[in-house]
Amino acid sequence: MDKLPPSMRKRLYSLPQQVGAKAWIMDEEEDAEEEGAGGRQDPSRRSIRLRPLPSPSPSAAAGGTESRSSALGAADSEGPARGAGKSSTNGDCRRFRGSLASLGSRGGGSGGTGSGSSHGHLHDSAEERRLIAEGDASPGEDRTPPGLAAEPERPGASAQPAASPPPPQQPPQPASASCEQPSVDTAIKVEGGAAAGDQILPEAEVRLGQAGFMQRQFGAMLQPGVNKFSLRMFGSQKAVEREQERVKSAGFWIIHPYSDFRFYWDLTMLLLMVGNLIIIPVGITFFKDENTTPWIVFNVVSDTFFLIDLVLNFRTGIVVEDNTEIILDPQRIKMKYLKSWFMVDFISSIPVDYIFLIVETRIDSEVYKTARALRIVRFTKILSLLRLLRLSRLIRYIHQWEEIFHMTYDLASAVVRIVNLIGMMLLLCHWDGCLQFLVPMLQDFPDDCWVSINNMVNNSWGKQYSYALFKAMSHMLCIGYGRQAPVGMSDVWLTMLSMIVGATCYAMFIGHATALIQSLDSSRRQYQEKYKQVEQYMSFHKLPPDTRQRIHDYYEHRYQGKMFDEESILGELSEPLREEIINFNCRKLVASMPLFANADPNFVTSMLTKLRFEVFQPGDYIIREGTIGKKMYFIQHGVVSVLTKGNKETKLADGSYFGEICLLTRGRRTASVRADTYCRLYSLSVDNFNEVLEEYPMMRRAFETVALDRLDRIGKKNSILLHKVQHDLNSGVFNYQENEIIQQIVQHDREMAHCAHRVQAAASATPTPTPVIWTPLIQAPLQAAAATTSVAIALTHHPRLPAAIFRPPPGSGLGNLGAGQTPRHLKRLQSLIPSALGSASPASSPSQVDTPSSSSFHIQQLAGFSAPAGLSPLLPSSSSSPPPGACGSPSAPTPSAGVAATTIAGFGHFHKALGGSLSSSDSPLLTPLQPGARSPQAAQPSPAPPGARGGLGLPEHFLPPPPSSRSPSSSPGQLGQPPGELSLGLATGPLSTPETPPRQPEPPSLVAGASGGASPVGFTPRGGLSPPGHSPGPPRTFPSAPPRASGSHGSLLLPPASSPPPPQVPQRRGTPPLTPGRLTQDLKLISASQPALPQDGAQTLRRASPHSSGESMAAFPLFPRAGGGSGGSGSSGGLGPPGRPYGAIPGQHVTLPRKTSSGSLPPPLSLFGARATSSGGPPLTAGPQREPGARPEPVRSKLPSNL
């Protein structure tokens, strides 16, 4: 109903009441509490309560109809009075309540009995105690006329009011304590009252409505509004509403100092005071005629406003600085104002000069007037100067406005003070300039005054004011005396006064300006002061220059030129605000850390609130191995190295963390951590670490799993962590989703470690000086052409070349074994290198080295074998786990298989024996060269060639048993081979180009013969060195080591005995297959530099040995065979002479077109047993087999003279 317009509410209130019930507008709270507190009624909290009326007495039922009609008339007369004050836009819902005395007894007329009268009297007394008159009017409003609000008589009431004496009147209820005089409205109904009420209804409604609206609007201007300034001063909207109630209850015309009316009035007085303080000195000093109309009007208007302000100050509340409560009591306001600034304001507001002139003009004596005329004028000017005392009022108002601007617009208080000080200095300079001219004028311009000396007596007032102002500012700024030094005594004293005032103002200005400048960048000033103390400390202790420089760099990186007391600042904030700030400051850390990305947000917040920021310089040891750990660290920015004894260092970069292992195990540090760059870290103490993990057990399990994985990567174990993790796994504490999250965190940690290794290898690897022939193929076609000639292969085995050429690069070979290698295996594998290099026999002459086919080199390159450092980007990555079929499970060969290879039964045992899983090292340059599919024959077991065991010097339990041979063409020497050597075969996918016709399925003999391969380069054979004229024996394959996680690759110039490889080429998901265009392009690049093979080599290719029909045509033994066995017996188990391409199918000859003339050959690789088609030309075919024991013809290569 409160949302209805006032006219409709008045109509609803004037409706006739029901007989059995009556509607009452009441507050939900108790009326007595509301009135006692003087509180404001909230219209939205009102509700309608229906109170049942007592049934009329039987004796009073006779006159029910008449009383009902009179009640309706009284209700009509009551409506306007009640509705006049219901619509209050200002919330002014004040009430004055009272009680009505009944005008007649409840008994019936002449027929009423005494008992009936007594019964009616009781009900009438209960009715009288009800609240009837609820007028909503302010204390200043007129009371409701009695004739307008008459209580409707109850049904059955008697028409003769004088039949019985009226009952005693209800005593008036006390109104609010803040009201001056409580009142009681008593409405008396007389005969004809309803008619009188009907006659005055329209006029009273209009008059009361207009008066109430104006009073409410004006009253709202005297109360504090709900704005930004009031909310900051009082704290909340409820407090502002309570202050509004205090203003209404304080009395009539009490003005709140924060009200809108006082705000605009102060603004008007401020402008008027500034005008007076500027215009009045100029008018008094430079204008002699002060009786002009504009001057009089200006003074009268100004004085009138100041007198009104003087009166309003007695009704305006006073703000006490030491107390939050504002004084609103009129008596206290009056006493406090009289004791403070009343006298000064009164004197500055009274027109004393005009009063003096009026008094003086009443004297009729002409002589007196003539004698006193000049003195009267002078005295009047002096009295006019009393208006300048309004400066005190200006200062008070400016001070209030400083608070308003500071609270409302957040302006710096120092800036406001500077502006006020500048304005005050300019005003004092203005007054001083007027004073410099006023004093000589009051003395009638003596000859020694500066005005007479400069002949400025009769000049215009503008020129006089300009020179006077110049003279005054020269004195106040202490820069001179103006045009000339003072001569007369009055000028001397005025000059001294100006100097004193000016020096004081100048000192105040310098002080405020200095404070303002310092407050603009206090954090930088604090940093500079702190660093000055540090410099004095370093000088006092005579620290060396390098230490001083490190301290200087630390301060620059740690504080970056600004210093804050961050702990104190965050400690003063609330908990939600502090968490929000910390989350914002650590947003980069959270974004770069997978641990936080997969964790609960509450865990992240709890962890971040306990972090402490630290900075470390390059070379600082953050933690040391063997010490007791008290902190763990999170890397926000920087690179650190994890150093362990006997293992290669590990790099950690942005988003990683370390130092958690000893916090979990409560032990000592398992590794040292050194900062490589400037590192910005966040540390977490052990107490806070355990406190957070107690609330989040899943994150404790994640920390333990990652710590166990990290220990495994550096070759260490911790039984406590292992027991905890296994216990959690067995107990099933965590569900599947939580386990998946933990596994994701562990996987992210591994990937970040691998990324750090790749970054380290790319940033810190320095290439060793090697011949141009070892330069990678991708750098220059000419270098690639030189690297693929037969000279490159011959240089590999030349005995007179320096050993530095064949030394493995820093990032490859045995020097960079992965974390999985233990020191025991490392020493054992390193012991094989000197003997292998020392016993290797070179080729008889470079001319005896044949040029192998391009297919063999591509196969070996794509198979994932080790390569020199220059070829490391081109090598495929190996999987972190052994691929399917690594354990030697046989599978049926398919006709479409391109190459048949051998695998090792029981390779998984050999893999585990070497310790640790193989980590992958990806290279972006490698993905186009990886084969698109694995050959199904890769997992097919095949017999080991003769002499395939015993050459590596490995323990017998590491080597698998030789599988049974399925090749019908295997020689008897192959069956009787001595055990002890290892044969490994790798398979690649078919490498064919669009020019290559489809191949037919291979016979079983070819599958069995594919087990042959090249022996490890540099390994010592069992027998002696055989001359190169012996027929080649069954070659041995080359066990290649996969790339490590650190990015290192094995060298082809040293035997890579670091670890066994998986027996087939692993393929990563999403890797595109090798495109034939890449091979064709390589062929076209080299074809110009090497146009054709030597003719002798072409002739030799047409010859084939019967015993070599089962061998792969891509197998090239590079060393002379040991022993003097001939033919294909292979009983000696040694290495054969420099090999030639042999046909894979008997009865066919091998042809090499010109396009395949070693053009696309990579740098020399160790040769393996494999077979592939020729890229860029027709398939290679085998020539007729040569007789057993026939000596192969030596092939002399035609090399350019520059090589």
Curated annotation (Swiss-Prot):
Ranges of the Cytoplasmic topological domain: 1-263, 315-336, 400-413, 518-1203
Binding site for 3',5'-cyclic AMP: G659, E660, C662, R669, T670, V673, R710
GO molecular function: cAMP binding; identical protein binding; intracellularly cAMP-activated cation channel activity; voltage-gated potassium channel activity; voltage-gated potassium channel activity involved in SA node cell action potential depolarization; voltage-gated sodium channel activity
Ranges of biased composition (kind: Acidic residues): 26-36
Outcome after substituting F564T: Alters the channel response to c-di-GMP
PTM (free text): S-palmitoylated.
Its membrane topology: Multi-pass membrane protein
Listed Pro residues bias regions: 163-174, 995-1004, 1029-1042
Signal peptide positions (record): none
Chain segments annotated as transmembrane: 264-286, 294-314, 337-359, 379-399, 414-436, 492-517
SUPFAM superfamilies membership: cAMP-binding domain-like, Voltage-gated potassium channels
Effect listed in the UniProt record for changing S672R: In SSS2; results in decreased affinity for cAMP but does not abolish channel activation; shifts the current activation range to hyperpolarized voltages; slows channel opening and speeds up channel closure
Region feature Disordered, mapped onto this chain: 1-182, 836-856, 870-897, 918-1203
GO biological process, one term: sodium ion transmembrane transport
Annotated glycosylation sites: N458
General function of this protein: Hyperpolarization-activated ion channel that are permeable to Na(+) and K(+) ions with very slow activation and inactivation. Exhibits higher selectivity for K(+) over Na(+) ions. Contributes to the native pacemaker currents in heart (If) that regulate the rhythm of heart beat. Contributes to the native pacemaker currents in neurons (Ih). May mediate responses to sour stimuli.
Family designation: Belongs to the potassium channel HCN family.
Domain notes: Contains six transmembrane segments (S1-S6) and an intervening P-loop. The segment S4 is the voltage-sensor and is characterized by a series of positively charged amino acids at every third position, while the S5-S6 segments together with the P-loop form a centrally located pore of the channel. Contains a cyclic nucleotide-binding domain (CNBD) in their C-terminal region. The CNBD is connected to the pore forming transmembrane segment via the C-linker. Contains a unique pocket located in the cytosolic C-terminal domain, identified as a likely binding site for di-cyclic nucleotides.
Name of the protein: Potassium/sodium hyperpolarization-activated cyclic nucleotide-gated channel 4
